[in-house]
């Protein structure tokens, strides 16, 4: 039965899309028939090949772009209606962005009226941990420093939905570690984070829900627990049901059906390659 957004009661804060499609007149569809539910209390990983539409999906969720067809709702609200109560609970950190020629302190003073739960003390603490001087002009910072400054501000806004597009690009190794720690402590049962990334290793330990997009739409959407219940990762034994395998520096690694319910360490990169190689086989297993 199809889901009717206009009449259903939303019982928890959630991003929902239904048959969401976006394309330019002169180009193929960038997104095709995306139906998703992303709930609070999770860090969602949004994965896909270059040009598959991950950034576009984030922009549609924010109302920066208008869908060609289909629907998107954030806590039951259409982003295109520009309702203040939705935008006060939603923030995006783009991969690339321009900030005014102000210090982080002055930028925060200018923007905090839009975010009722903004906490100035938290921003200063995050900035200090990320080694950002809140009095330095943003224009004078390197790309990595600007990104860390914006991350500090975004976390201090305490929004319920935080969207991040390649958040670790430009961060050095110590900053990535600090970023992971701050983000892990940010999410609670009333907040969600959606991370679009190619740098899976930077955030793999944070993700508890995985969404993989391909040219046909949503290739896979599952929690990490569901994935590890269905699949196992590692070296294949003689009787294993192998769905995908590849040669790595560590030897031949495989994605296999987890028939015996064994404990397994999720390998998101291997999972992504398996879904890309044979979407149908993975889908058939998850749909049983």
What residue ranges belong to the model's regions?
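A short, flexible loop at the N-terminus of ABC-type nucleotide-binding domains that lies
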Residues: 5-33, 40
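ABC-family P-loop ATPase nucleotide-binding domains
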Residues: 85, 92-149
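Catalytic Walker B motif of ABC-type/P-loop ATPase nucleotide-binding domains
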Residues: 162-166
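The feature captures the beta-strand-to-loop junction immediately N-terminal to the Walker
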Residues: 47-49
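ABC transporter nucleotide-binding domain
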Residues: 178-194, 198-256
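Short loop immediately C-terminal to the Walker-B catalytic DE motif
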Residues: 168-172
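Helix-to-loop junction immediately C-terminal to a conserved catalytic motif
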Residues: 62
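Conserved ABC transporter NBD signature motif
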Residues: 70-78, 85-86
């Amino acid at each position: 039965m199809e889901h009717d957004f206009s009449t259903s009661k939303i019982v928890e804060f959630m991003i929902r899309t239904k048959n969401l499609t976006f394309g330019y007149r002169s180009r193929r569809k960038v997104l095709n028939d995306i139906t998703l539910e992303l709930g609070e209390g999770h860090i969602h990983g949004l994965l896909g090949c270059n040009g598959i539409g991950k950034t576009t999906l984030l922009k549609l969720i924010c109302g920066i772009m208008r869908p060609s067809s289909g629907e998107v709702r954030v806590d039951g609200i259409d982003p295109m209606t520009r309702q203040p109560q939705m935008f006060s609970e939603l923030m995006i950190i783009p991969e690339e962005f321009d900030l005014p020629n102000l210090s982080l302190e002055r930028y925060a003073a200018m923007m905090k009226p839009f975010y009722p739960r903004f906490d100035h003390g938290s921003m200063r603490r995050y900035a200090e941990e990320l080694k950002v001087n809140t009095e330095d002009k943003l224009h004078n910072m390197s790309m990595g420093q600007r990104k860390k400054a914006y991350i500090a501000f975004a976390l201090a806004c305490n929004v319920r939905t935080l969207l991040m597009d390649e958040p670790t690009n430009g961060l050095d190794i110590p900053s990535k570690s600090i970023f992971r720690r701050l983000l892990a402590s940010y999410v609670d049962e009333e907040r969600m984070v959606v991370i679009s990334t190619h740098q899976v290793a930077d955030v793999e330990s944070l993700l508890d829900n995985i969404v993989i997009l391909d040219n046909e739409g949503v290739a896979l959407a599952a929690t990490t627990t569901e994935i590890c219940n269905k699949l196992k990762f590692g070296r294949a034994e003689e009787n294993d049901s192998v769905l995908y395998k590849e040669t790595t520096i560590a030897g031949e690694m495989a994605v296999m059906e987890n028939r015996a319910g064994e404990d397994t360490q999720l390998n998101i990169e291997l999972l992504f390659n398996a879904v890309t190689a044979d979407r149908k086989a993975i889908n058939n297993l998850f749909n049983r």
